[in-house]
From Swiss-Prot:
The N-terminus interacts with KaiC, while the C-terminal histidine kinase domain autophosphorylates and is probably responsible for self-oligomerization. The N-terminal domain stimulates the C-terminus to autophosphorylate. InterPro entries: HATPase_C_sf, His_kinase_dom, HisK_dim/P_dom, HisK_dim/P_sf, KaiB_domain, Kinase_SasA, Sensor_HK_Regulatory, Sig_transdc_His_kin-like_C. It catalyses: ATP + protein L-histidine = ADP + protein N-phospho-L-histidine. This is Adaptive-response sensory kinase SasA. The gene is sasA. Homooligomerizes. Interacts with KaiC. Participates in the KaiABC clock complex, whose core is composed of a KaiC homohexamer, 6 KaiB and up to 6 KaiA dimers. SasA and KaiB(fs) compete to bind to KaiC. SUPFAM superfamilies: ATPase domain of HSP90 chaperone/DNA topoisomerase II/histidine kinase (SSF55874), Homodimeric domain of signal transducing histidine kinase (SSF47384), Thioredoxin-like (SSF52833). It is an enzyme of class 2 (transferase). Member of the two-component regulatory system SasA/RpaA involved in genome-wide circadian gene expression. One of several clock output pathways. Participates in the Kai clock protein complex, the main circadian regulator in cyanobacteria, via its interaction with KaiC. KaiC enhances the autophosphorylation activity of SasA, which then transfers its phosphate group to RpaA to activate it. In addition to its output function, recruits fold-shifted KaiB (KaiB(fs)) to KaiC to cooperatively form the KaiB(6):KaiC(6) complex (independent of SasA kinase activity).
């Protein structure tokens, strides 16, 4: 009798373990194999009129672990899993193979059935009657073990990624806490200087010129804003809410990465007869960053530099080990530069300078650059080139030694 047509092998479904002959038919959803599968199933249905056997049909798309378990390389495939030895029939002539093997399979199954009848009369040491093992059920268990093993492997990889992200955040928090000292010290010095020279009796500052008082107040205010921003960054890192971009940080040689990008853009700047000057120290430490994301930043900044630098102009690239925890990378051009009033807004999404409204401007892609650098808990900014043009700078965390 044909059993369990088009069902998945599962420990939860009924298993006809009393059937001495047990077969698995592996199929897939390809239209080309549909007719062949139908012919195989029809032939098996004819055989069941003469002999009782167990058949389960398995869709490899739904249960790939079973296909992996049996190391199948093609479907459809018919497998005799019981009685031993196991046999696999595959290819375009499965029915022909089955016709040749069927008498032997039937004889082996009959022999096994006779042995099982003899076992029914035996008892084990505990007085229990020995029972035949369900081979199909054991296959289901094997498939489940394969699936669980795969899941464990994936979970281990996820765990490693999460640990790396936690370690990255720990280093970033340590870096930001360390960097808080500079603006705190500068603000404290300015406030202490003002406090020590203020005479409350007359309501005036002594020994301080008005211009210096204004400058000290401005410095204290500027440093307070810097501290406020850094605290916001710390809170964001602690909450883990920076989900705008997914980065996979690793040890990255940013100098080498920049030279690779320059090689890709060589035709662009040589066509305009532009000169490229690099000042990247050989001992510049590696950064802890996502190389593909940083490549995007470098391509965007260098593309803009080439675009806005006139023919025969100069593009400058420099690397600087700014602190023990930061590397600064800078790209300069000799183009028209960025007006001071626009240097903050230039990183806004789709923002263009008035002069660039008729064409693609700096704002295209710079917002992405800012998002990428911020995702690395770095900073990006622009200032003027003394020789004309603009310098774009960004910082990245140093890879821990």
């Amino acid at each position: 009798m044909l059993k369990h047509d088009s069902m998945q092998v599962s420990q939860d479904q009924p298993i006809y373990s009393e059937a001495p002959l047990q077969l698995l038919l592996f199929v897939d959803g390809r239209p080309k194999s549909k007719q062949q599968v139908q012919r195989i199933r029809a032939y098996l249905k004819d055989l069941q009129a003469e002999y009782n056997f167990e058949l389960q049909i398995i869709d490899v798309g739904q249960q790939p672990y079973l296909a992996e378990h049996f190391k199948l390389v093609a479907t459809p495939a018919l497998i005799k899993i019981h009685p031993e030895p196991r046999q696999i029939l595959a290819g375009s002539n499965i029915i022909t193979q089955l016709k040749n093997l069927w008498p032997r399979w039937q004889a082996a199954a009959d022999t096994y059935a006779k042995l099982q009848e003899d076992l029914q009369e035996r008892v084990d040491d505990n007085g229990r009657v020995a029972q035949p093992q369900s081979t199909i059920n054991s296959v289901a268990v094997s498939a489940e073990l394969l699936r669980l093993s795969d899941e464990i492997f994936n979970l281990k990889q996820e765990k490693e990624k999460l640990l790396e992200q936690l370690q990255f955040k720990d280093r970033v928090i340590a870096m930001l806490v360390h960097d808080l000292r500079n603006p705190l010290t500068a603000a404290a010095i300015a406030i202490e200087t003002l406090q020590s020279n203020y005479n409350p009796d007359i309501g005036q500052f002594q020994r301080l010129k008005p211009a210096l008082v204004v400058n000290l107040l401005r410095q204290a205010r500027t440093q307070a804003k810097t501290i406020d921003k850094m605290i916001a960054d710390l809170l964001q890192v602690g909450r883990g809410t920076d989900t705008e971009l997914i980065i996979i940080p690793q040890k990255t040689e940013i100098g080498l990465l920049c030279l690779e990008v320059l090689g890709e853009l060589r035709d662009r700047y040589t066509t305009k007869a532009q000169k490229v000057e690099t000042d990247i120290p050989q001992d510049l430490p590696c950064v802890y960053a996502d190389p593909e994301r940083i490549r995007q930043v470098l391509i965007n900044l260098l593309d803009n530099a080439i675009k806005y630098t006139p023919e025969g102009g100069t593009i400058s690239i420099a690397g600087l080990h700014r602190t023990t925890q930061k590397v600064q990378f800078s790209i300069g051009d000799t183009g028209p530069g960025i007006p001071s009033d626009n240097r903050e807004r230039i990183f806004e999404n789709h923002y263009r300078l008035e002069r660039d409204e008729a064409k693609e401007g700096y704002g295209i892609g710079l917002s992405l650059c800012q998002r990428i650098i911020r995702a690395h808990y770095g900073q990006i900014w622009v200032d003027s080139n003394p020789h004309g043009g603009a310098w774009f700078h960004f910082t990245l965390p140093v890879y821990p030694s």
